[in-house]
Amino acid sequence: MAQPVPRLSIPAALALGSAALGAAFATGLLLGKRWPPWGSRRQERLLPPEDNPLWQYLLSRSMREHPALRSLRLLTLEQPQGDSMMTCEQAQLLANLARLIKAKKALDLGTFTGYSALALALALPEAGRVVTCEVDAEPPKLGRPMWKQAEVEQKIDLRLQPALQTLDELLAAGEAGTFDIAVVDADKENCTAYYERCLQLLRPGGVLAVLRVLWRGEVLQPQPRNKTVECVRNLNERILRDARVYISLLPLDDGLSLAFKI
């Protein structure tokens, strides 16, 4: 019998397998039915108990995490608010999508410690580029050594300024329609503006991913209790009705929306 795989000790590997992509989708669909996205912090992230046999099986049969990614994830989880980082399942799914569409240019809104930027950079070719946006200069310092360790530091363009400013600069520089994938995990008050600008920057066939679109289940409230919940709900409605994209909303972690530009 296989030994349990602790959530924070997932085997690392570099290879890409089509089964991993399917497992990521299946994991979200299964966990979304069994564990609601509210309550304790673990429940908020749609995670079952670490000793759950089915969860162990899913992790052990799907996760292929680069050593530098694993190291950065473990370091991040030791930091204040470290659990606000994208989960390894989400990172692997987005990296696999980037590989699937042969992405060369990526946007990453909300660098934090650089885990998502690293995952994307590893999925891009040697000449690939990840533009990652962060307003706080401190968290990315944790990730820089791992970017270097993974030999992708040259692919990552860190912009320490408001994400909207970076997006507007890219549009002004004539880069509309040139990006392949965009990941939005930044403040929710500007999420609609991020969505619209990223959509302009993406090429047809590009992928736009928005994280935390269930917001701990508060999107179910009849009346949003704050501006953040209202913004998330408004964005979800906008994406649903947007004829410019094909969509999927997955119950991975606190909700992951995927919009595929037509």
Curated annotation (Swiss-Prot):
The keyword 4Fe-4S appears for this protein: no
| UniProt keyword terms in alphabetical order | Membrane, Methyltransferase, S-adenosyl-L-methionine, Signal-anchor, Transferase, Transmembrane, Transmembrane helix
Q: How does the record classify its membrane topology?
A: Single-pass type II membrane protein
Q: Which biological process, per GO, is one annotated for this protein? A: methylation
Q: Where in the cell is it found?
A: Membrane
- Gene Ontology MF term list: O-methyltransferase activity
Residue numbers binding S-adenosyl-L-methionine: 108, 110-111, 116, 134-135, 163, 185, 187, 194
- Its domain of life reads Eukaryota
Does Cell cycle appear among the keywords?
A: no
Record-level GO cellular component terms: membrane; mitochondrion
Q: Which residues cross the membrane?
A: 12-32
Top EC group: transferase
- The EC code for this enzyme is 2.1.1.-
Complex and partners:
Homodimer.
Its biological purpose is as follows:
Putative O-methyltransferase.
The family line of this record is: Belongs to the class I-like SAM-binding methyltransferase superfamily. Cation-dependent O-methyltransferase family.
Name-wise, this protein is Catechol O-methyltransferase domain-containing protein 1
Q: Which organism is it from?
A: Mus musculus
